[in-house]
From Swiss-Prot:
Compartments (UniProt record): Endoplasmic reticulum membrane
Protein name listed in UniProt: Triple QxxK/R motif-containing protein
Family named by the database record: Belongs to the TRIQK family.
Originating organism: Pongo abelii
One Gene Ontology CC term in the entry: endoplasmic reticulum membrane
Alphabetical UniProt keywords: Endoplasmic reticulum, Membrane, Transmembrane, Transmembrane helix
Length: 86
C-alpha cells in the first residue's frame, strides 16, 4: 500500500522540469508556427524557374508558328517567280 502512495507523489525536480517544458513550448509555439507558414509559402509560391519555363514554351510555340507560315509563304512565291521569268 505504501508503494501506491509513493508512485503518485512526483518529485519536485520532475515537477520543475515539466513546468519548464510547458513554458518552453509556449515560447516556441509562435516561432514554430511562423516557420511552418514560411515553409508552406515557399512550397506554394510560383518560382522563377516555372515562370521562365512557361515563357520559353510560349516563345517556342510562337516561333514555330512564325517559321511554319514563313516557310509556307516563301515556297509558294518561288515557283511563281520562275514561271514569270520564262
Amino acid at each position: 500500500m505504501g508503494r501506491k502512495d509513493a508512485a503518485t507523489i512526483k518529485l519536485p525536480v520532475d515537477q520543475y522540469r515539466k513546468q519548464i517544458g510547458k513554458q518552453d513550448y509556449k515560447k516556441t509555439k509562435p516561432i514554430l508556427r511562423a516557420t511552418k507558414l514560411k515553409a508552406e509559402a515557399k512550397k506554394t509560391a510560383i518560382g522563377i524557374k516555372e515562370v521562365g519555363l512557361v515563357l520559353a514554351a510560349i516563345l517556342a510555340l510562337l516561333l514555330a508558328f512564325y517559321a511554319f507560315f514563313y516557310l509556307r509563304l516563301t515556297t509558294d512565291d518561288d515557283p511563281d517567280l520562275d514561271q514569270d521569268e520564262d
